[in-house]
Every structure is written in C-alpha cells, then in structure tokens.
C-alpha cells in the first residue's frame, strides 16, 4: 500500500543557554510552526501537500567531559485506531557551544496528496544516552481534506530557500517565503489562482497602497488534472523598525473564493 505519509528529520539545532546544574530530562515549549524558525502555527492540522513542523526544547541533558550531548529522538504518528502511519528514529549528537544542558529540536511531517483524515496522535520520545533518561509527549493532529487552503508556508533568508528564517528579522534584511495552495477548482479544465501580499502596521493599517499580486494560470486540460498544488514564492523587505503583520491572501479566480493567513513580523535594529 502506498504510504500517504513521509516522515523526515529536517534538523536538530543546538541553541543552548546556561543552567546551574543538570536537572531531570524534560521537553518544553512544544509548538507547531511555519518552518523550523517561523512563527507559531496555532492548529496541529495536516492537509494534502502540507508540511507541518513541530519544534520543542529539550532540557536537563547530561554532557560528557567535552560538553557534548548524545541523544536519540523517536517520532511516531498513529491514527485513531492506533495504526502506525509513520515512524522514524534519529540520533542527535552535538557540542553545546553556549554551555548549559538544553537545545532545540524540530521535526517535520511532509504530506503527499492524501492525508489520514480525522484524529491522529503524534508521539515523540527523546532519550539521553549519557544519563539513560527519557522524556516524551503526545499531541493530537487532525487530518483534513483539501479545501482552498494555504499550506506548507516557510520562511527563508535567501531566495533559493536554503536558509530557514524567523519572521523576527533585522532592519534591512529581506524576508523570503514560499507556500503551496490546494483545493482550487478544476471543473472548467483550467486553473487561475491569485496570491496577494500585504503588510499591516501595529494598528492594523495597510502599509502598501496596493498589495503585491502574483498569478498562476494553467489552461492545458491534462496539466490541470495532474496539478495537485500551486507553488508560490515571494518576499518583503524589512525597511523599518517595529511590529507588523504579513497578510497572505489566495483567491481562486475560477470561483472567486478566497482564504487568507496572517503571521507576525518583528523588525529590530542590527
């Protein structure tokens, strides 16, 4: 049977801070997010062609004489009946260069054209090979069918999408992002999807006189049937200090239905 689920480790990033003494191994601050460093994604939901990132902080790690930690992370997704949809274990070994006993871990759940619809459970266990302690958590994840939706939103420092970024940036930096659109109408054997980008200030006032607009059109009937998602890339410049909102609106011009997504952007001095 073809799996609808591809489980992949995107990375384990060492982001440590000082701690007075080793404590009990714990997992803290579990978040769904838009990319490894992007803003929090409030709902633990999966859509076709989505890419759900989950990040968390592991604390209370034991290190060896050189300051190195040695852990393994087990990730499992099961459906409502307990059937395993995907399972993966990876090792994470690294030097805690800022000291302390903690680091940030992130994993992602990239989906194919089908998702396990309904209630699922994500299970993650972290094992410290040096202290022989383990910590784990579970989160419910809801699989949903593909209505018109923005999915797999991620942010980057570069246009090529190789350097993941936060939406907390320094003055003068560009902020690149990419996303997929699903659930558009194909009944007329054509696709016409529009992406509009606008930014808002702290009071909710629109900054751009007109939104930045990108269009995707496909009129070849065979290509239309084989197109599962529309891929967009765009960027904004962080030209002034403050707190802002990035508003991304997608419109299916075949039906004039729209959906939008808003994320916070903070610009600080270098």
Label every model-predicted segment.
Residues 7-16:
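Bacterial N-terminal signal peptides
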